[in-house]
Amino acid sequence: MAENKKYDESAIQVLEGLEAVRKRPGMYIGSTDNKGLHHLVWEIVDNAIDEALAGYCTQIDVILEKDNSITVIDNGRGIPTGMHKTGKPTPEVIFSVLHAGGKFDSTAYKSSGGLHGVGSSVTNALSKRFKAIIYRDKKIHEIEFKNGGKLEKPLTFINTTYKTGTTINFLPDDTIFSNAKFNFSLISERLKESALLNSGLKITLSDLISNRYVEYQFQDGLVEFVKELVDDKTPVTDIITINNESKNIIVEIALQYTEDDNEIILGFANNVKTIDGGTHLVGFKSGLIRAINDYAKDQKILKDKTKLDSNDLREGLVAIVTVKIPENLIEYEGQTKSKLGTSDAKTVVEQIVYEFMSYWLIENKVLANKVIENALNAQKARIAAKQARQAIKSVKGKKNVNKLMLGKLTPAQGKKRELNELYLVEGDSAGGSAKSGRDRNFQAILPLRGKVINSEKAKLVDLLKNEEIQSIINAIGAGVGKDFDISDINYGKIIIMTDADTDGAHIQTLLLTFFYRHMKDLIIHKKVYIALPPLYKITFNDKSFIYLWDEEELNKFNKTNTKKYEIQRYKGLGEMNADQLWQTTMDPKNRKIIQVTISDGLLAERMFKTLMGDDVEKRKLWIQENVKFTLEDDQIQIIEMEK
């Protein structure tokens, strides 16, 4: 990185005081669910990573403590401990004043992930306990807060030291978060990603509750990142790396073409994942496609005015695109930093990629021709798949072939599509009960009788031959694959309803894999849900009854109940009659449903590859760590994974 100027008390600026964070936490961390809880961790970790970006930190240690607090340790410069111009010690300002930090201009940090002084103070505001130990200027200082940022122990000199760095420990406030327990796997994946983006940086994660430990350090991070994503895909090219700088914007890219049908392109700006893309990814795609088309034209592979389609040329592409942009140039669209808006990033990345790839294609003609051959094959497959999709669409208009849906879909009678719901139900038995128990005004039922094909292993043209897949596509009514149009869907909710067992979980995963690969906008626009049927029916002697949804609810019931009762454990949806199914699983007033969302595309890729791939041991381990047939929240983000 380029030189960084002084980082001391004078570099800390205050924009406004800390107000109303506890009253409206969603404004600062997005939500108070699992995602919001872990956002507290990312803010503290990202501060440490900014020290690494600036060239002062080589190791970050994260510890999940036994009391469910979390500790983040870095060996950076340490937070300045002198008096701030506001008359308070600088650490007190950083941790108790919103928008206080050293990253609002380019004096202390040339580029950083964001205004992380905000994060430190917000993390403090949403914690029962927050403590910082600072190693700087051969001295150790401590400062402590409690109950949402109230100063418990002023900045205090503790001892002398030769170390430098900062240690933060905080305990989230369980009166604010719906579930204040940290997820080891989620944190591990995020830390691994940070290590991959910062070559040489060592990051460790320890869980003192379950005695787990992982360590990440990569000497060639982006190359390793691409290897992770490519995994068992068949490569077409070697991994290509591009590193250059223009207009004070540093561009680092690693990419590889594979034989796979899907593309994976992830973008980062100053280490922040841009889940909605932005100017850097627009520039990357434009530069790459222009270089390949120009090469194909120069080599007489294509006719004069013929150009390969951008989608066909990106099929099978795996790429990581990172840019480091000075603070005075970086712009994001919206508050969440999910989309880069810096206009210079497009022109810089496009020119760097175009020049490099133009040279690479000429120097690697055999591989270049293979990339173009694959694009031409993708074009043929796209046309064949389109014809198959059109054939499926035409089923609706042909009486003699309308038997595909006959006896399967029981439609809703309501005309307002956004209010209608489609239940995808496991088996004929449950499908029959669902048809009888539904509210026909807005609920449609599609029983799934046969086997849903594994979308992770089959090409789209083969998927479209599967009868269950055809039925789902027809029922949803918005096309599939590249032709999918979210504005055409027939339902505001698509609800997967299966038995609460491993077979049911497998069907859920098959359907979610299909939606993720070929109707991703359904998940992005939060249209997909999973129904949670109860596990137990409790019947009392007076014939009154209640339903319990999981073991935890049963345990709570047993601790407080004083009446005699009989208990029924439901093994499947088919054991419930129509009235019971309506009362417990379909009535909007009583049911519990999970909304499926995507917040991290990399985790999504890994999850689907693990669950639907060939590695049995990896799949078993993932299920053991992540799959629980119980309810934690009425709405859980099952797939916490960037688009």
From Swiss-Prot:
EC nos: 5.6.2.2
Cofactor dependency: Mg(2+); Mn(2+); Ca(2+)
One Pfam family per UniProt: DNA_gyraseB_C
One of the protein's GO biological processes: DNA topological change
Gene Ontology MF: a single term: metal ion binding
Chief place where the protein resides: cytoplasm
Binding site for Mg(2+) 1: E426, D499
Annotated site residue numbers, Interaction with DNA: K451, N454
Keywords per UniProt: ATP-binding, Cytoplasm, DNA-binding, Isomerase, Magnesium, Metal-binding, Nucleotide-binding, Topoisomerase
Gene3D superfamilies cross-referenced by the UniProt entry: 3.30.230.10, 3.40.50.670, Histidine kinase-like ATPase, C-terminal domain
GO CC, one annotated term: chromosome
Catalysed reactions, as listed in the record: ATP-dependent breakage, passage and rejoining of double-stranded DNA
Domain Toprim: 420-534
Keyword Metal-binding: yes
Note: There is a bona fide GyrB elsewhere in this organism (UniProtKB:Q2ST75).
NCBIfam families per UniProt: parE_Gpos, PRK05644.1
Complexes and interactors: Heterotetramer composed of ParC and ParE.
Role according to the record: Topoisomerase IV is essential for chromosome segregation. It relaxes supercoiled DNA. Performs the decatenation events required during the replication of a circular DNA molecule.
UniProt protein name: DNA topoisomerase 4 subunit B
Organism of provenance: Mycoplasma capricolum subsp. capricolum (strain California kid / ATCC 27343 / NCTC 10154)
